[in-house]
UniProtKB/Swiss-Prot annotation:
It catalyses: D-dopachrome + H(+) = 5,6-dihydroxyindole + CO2. It comes from Xenopus laevis. This is D-dopachrome decarboxylase-A. Tautomerization of D-dopachrome with decarboxylation to give 5,6-dihydroxyindole (DHI). Pfam families: MIF (PF01187). One of its GO terms (molecular function) is D-dopachrome decarboxylase activity. It is an enzyme of class 4 (lyase). Keywords: Acetylation, Cytoplasm, Lyase, Melanin biosynthesis. GO terms for cellular component: cytoplasm; extracellular space.
Amino acid sequence: MPFVELETNLPSQNVPQDLAEKLCSATATILGKPRERVNVTVRTGVSMVVGGSSAPCTQLFISSIGVVGTAEQNKEHSAKFFNFLTEQLGLAQDRILLRFVPIEPWQIGKNGTIMTFL
């Protein structure tokens, strides 16, 4: 069950209106998870500084069970997420940061229980 949170200082009018839907589909493909299990949040107009500059930028936080736990996995995922974000947001790669966080099934609650028991 991936959780993906995108924050950008781009104003909403400079971000594709359907970015959350596109990011959901891209995440499902990149991580090899069913689309219906992907959770996406997009926040625009956030006050941000990356590399000492408030020029247009974005951060993408990716957490998931089992697919973001190794350097090899994340190197592959990173290239694909960078391609997606540069295409969708028109930002240079040096204005994009990704953070991968592996999580365990017992750390996610759903339907009155935790994923361990679903």
